[in-house]
């Protein structure tokens, strides 16, 4: 179920402060965050976030197509190692 429109998008307050601080200074640093639940806003376009996936930080460069989605969508938490092979079948 989608979030109510009257509530607006959720973004952690400290994340907005960090982005505004970088915009004022003009620097292009990576913004380290654990907030996978934050929605990507239009002011985030052009910035690079280091999003924590539970093990390490994954760099996420934000572009216009990502606006409205969550930061956690671009930092996968699970690695797929393939399905188990059938041990009865011998390959020739």
From Swiss-Prot:
PROSITE patterns, sorted: RIBOSOMAL_S19
GO biological process: ribosomal small subunit assembly; translation
Keywords: Ribonucleoprotein, Ribosomal protein, RNA-binding, rRNA-binding
Disulfide bridge positions per record: none
Ranges in a coiled coil: none
GO molecular function: rRNA binding; structural constituent of ribosome
Pfam family, one: Ribosomal_S19
Record family assignment: Belongs to the universal ribosomal protein uS19 family.
Annotated function: Protein S19 forms a complex with S13 that binds strongly to the 16S ribosomal RNA.
Protein name as catalogued: Small ribosomal subunit protein uS19
Phylogenetic lineage: Bacteria, Pseudomonadati, Pseudomonadota, Alphaproteobacteria, Rickettsiales
Recorded name of the encoding gene: rpsS
């Amino acid at each position: 179920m989608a979030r109510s429109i009257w509530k607006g998008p959720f973004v952690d307050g400290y994340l907005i402060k960090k982005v505004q601080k970088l915009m004022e200074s003009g620097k292009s640093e990576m913004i380290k965050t654990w907030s996978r639940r934050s929605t990507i806003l239009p002011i985030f376009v052009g910035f690079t976030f280091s999003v924590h996936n539970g093990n390490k930080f994954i760099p996420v460069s934000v572009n216009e197509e990502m606006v409205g989605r969550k930061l956690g969508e671009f930092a996968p938490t699970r690695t797929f190692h393939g399905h188990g092979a059938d041990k009865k079948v011998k390959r020739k």
